[in-house]
Amino acid sequence: KYDKIKGNFFAETPIGRIDVTSSKPALNGYQKSKCFFCYDYISIIKKSKNLCHVDHFFPDTLKGKDFSGYVDGIWNLVLSCKECNNGEGGKFKKLPKIELLERLNKRNEYFISSHHPLRETIILQTGNTIDQRRTFLQKCYNEAKIILIHTWGPKMIKGTPTF
């Protein structure tokens, strides 16, 4: 969610809000100013016309449900354009299509193999080995599909795929 007064993004938890805005620079280092879903140009600069949204790949509505993953974990956060996140025909609280799960896996493995500072956090949250992490993501996807039923994908690819 976005706090208009403070100008930051946050996630609601049973114990309060978690500010996820601070993850933008790290995520953008991988996404290279491209929306995770449609590859349109996005910016992490405040008040920018194309200001990105920090989006939960697996929607935050899964909190408190029969879902194995920590939804607010960095492994589950991506940068998206406004249209993909909550525009007309946007993702909102839907589950991204299965093809996008492979993109999330690839992104997480990039952070791990590049020895990015997020490496240890992603390993702790998703598993020690490539197989464990892939199994974890698939389990999360299967659980989310049962709960959410409907899947979503971007209307069109707007930029050149870069990841």
Briefly describe each language-model feature range.
Residues 1-43, 61-71:
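Short, charged surface segments at domain edges that flank catalytic/cofactor-binding sites
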Residues 1-21, 42, 128-163:
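A boundary/linker detector
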Residues 2-3, 88-92:
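Anionic ligand-binding catalytic core segments
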Residues 33-36, 90, 146:
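Intrinsically disordered or highly flexible coil/loop and linker segments, enriched in small
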Residues 34, 53, 80:
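The −1 position to Zn-ligating cysteines in a subset of zinc-ribbon hairpins
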Residues 39, 82-85:
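Cys/His-coordinated zinc-binding microdomains
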Residues 39-77, 90-104:
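Histidine-centered nuclease catalytic patch
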Residues 66-82, 109-131:
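Short Fe-S-cluster ligation motifs
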